[in-house]
């Protein structure tokens, strides 16, 4: 592993206004290159806020955050963000939605088309490249969103409940898909979810926050081998980790 952490939180606190109580307090966390770390916690505990701080979308009230040794405002080219909503532009085709990030970088049309084609093949959407978002399923829209996020070749992928709107079957499929893509790209992932099973399936480590203010209450190492497939969910080892995480989440909620 690199001597420079991919993400480093040092005693981070966040208030949205000076008179507000803190949303986050005393956050210390180190995430190494290539880790898949998921944040779990009750609603309102600051999970999404942590991602926004890393992305530089919100200022830190106190403490420090570094992304590959840089302050978030200087690390934006290293980061891509995938939100719960796919936020595709309805007047652009799938191909042109993915190409948008490349156009913003002023890449040549030939380069943009080549990169877009490769990414659509990677996420299994070459057959809908000329379709518009209205013709896509929820899972397909999320794949387009992920392909667009990968277009700039990020080191770090921030994912804020990206599969929350999907049914269970499609959610499980997308869980496998994101692990397959990560295997090919070797990026670091910081992921937010409310699903304990999803967190255990995806992650190398799970961080559980307690609320009011959000603090790190527990950390779980998920010692399950990659690559992971849906059959993992049927194993005793998986059930044991899900039960452990659920118990710790309940404890954090009561804290």
Predicted regions located by residue number:
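The feature captures the beta-strand-to-loop junction immediately N-terminal to the Walker
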Residues: 40-42
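Helix-to-loop junction immediately C-terminal to a conserved catalytic motif
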Residues: 55
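Conserved ABC transporter NBD signature motif
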Residues: 63-75
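Short coil-to-helix segment of the ABC ATPase nucleotide-binding domain corresponding to the Q-loop/switch region
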Residues: 92-99
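Conserved ABC ATPase "signature" region
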Residues: 99, 103, 110-127, 180
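Conserved signature/switch motifs of ABC ATPase nucleotide-binding domains
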Residues: 131-134, 152
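Hydrophobic anchor residue at the start of the ABC signature
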Residues: 146
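Catalytic Walker B motif of ABC-type/P-loop ATPase nucleotide-binding domains
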Residues: 157-160
